[in-house]
Amino acid sequence: MSKTRHDVFICPPLPHPVTTLTHELPDRHEIPRHLHPEHQLIYASRGVMSVWTGNGTWIVPPQRAVWIPAKTPHAITMYGAVSMRTLYVKPRLVRLSPNCRVVNVSPLLRELILHIVRLGMLEADNPAHGRLEDLLVDLLAAAETAPLELPLPADPRAAAFAERLLAEAGRSRFRK
């Protein structure tokens, strides 16, 4: 990752239409603020994540996924041990909302995510992978949004206060 102003890391572009990443992460693990040139679908088969952007925080419990549009700076915090499965999707494949959202993961979408993760990537010149891409695009377009967003206040004073609270939330005095 390359570092830019404001401590945002820019991840390098990935070579395939869909590329995956899998992590087993401990409680309170934090992934610092960064962005990707690809769209990102983050699914936790176990554990809870919170995803922060400049516009709000999305809570992502199991059986939900968060859609993060390409080039959206974000940070992620784990609550409990998390089994994270991520799909990085080239923007040319999917024309979804330009905003982050948490989606309900149907059993079919869950199995498709896990299958693509087992493959590691979907290659452009593989016809079977093309069919999986098409199914992924269709299922993402049909996925229902789950109301799990905590928007930041619009008032600048309230937003500054909320930012301070969020910055302090992970410190030990707030933990049990």
Positions of predicted regions on the chain:
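Basic, amphipathic alpha-helical hairpins
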Residues: 116-124, 139-147, 161-174
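N-terminal positioning helix adjacent to the helix-turn-helix/winged-helix DNA-binding module
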Residues: 128, 132, 153-161, 173
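Linker/hinge segments immediately adjacent to helix-turn-helix/homeobox DNA-binding domains
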Residues: 131-154
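Ligand-binding loop in jelly-roll beta-barrel domains
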Residues: 57, 71-100, 105
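A short beta-strand-loop-beta hairpin characteristic of the jelly-roll/cupin
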Residues: 42-61
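Generic protein-terminus/edge-of-domain signal
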Residues: 1-48
